[in-house]
């Protein structure tokens, strides 16, 4: 529906679709959504990116720059593959002081501002895909991506 709405916007030069893959295969889901977008024959390019497993996993990849703010304690540590953890929102909540919970509407923007792209790039393939998709849109290299 959003792509149909964007089609009516005369100044739309491209759309980045960014969603959580959750338990789905990020690559397959992105290809499926891109195929659906291609059928719409949109007058602008569309890039689809699926964060594996959740957008918030990128916060774990840059935890060193986030801890000490956003209700995350200075000593918070995550060990493991950030692209394999399910329930990142719950993990973030468990790090917070008692009575606090992670809320996308409250924490997501600030945590995103604190991300270190270099750290996240090294630890997350789906983030590298995001960067590539943005570059494709900027360069006007695509109609729909991935193919």
Describe every region a protein language model picked out:
Residues 2-147:
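C-terminal accessory helical subdomains adjacent to catalytic cores in phosphodiester-
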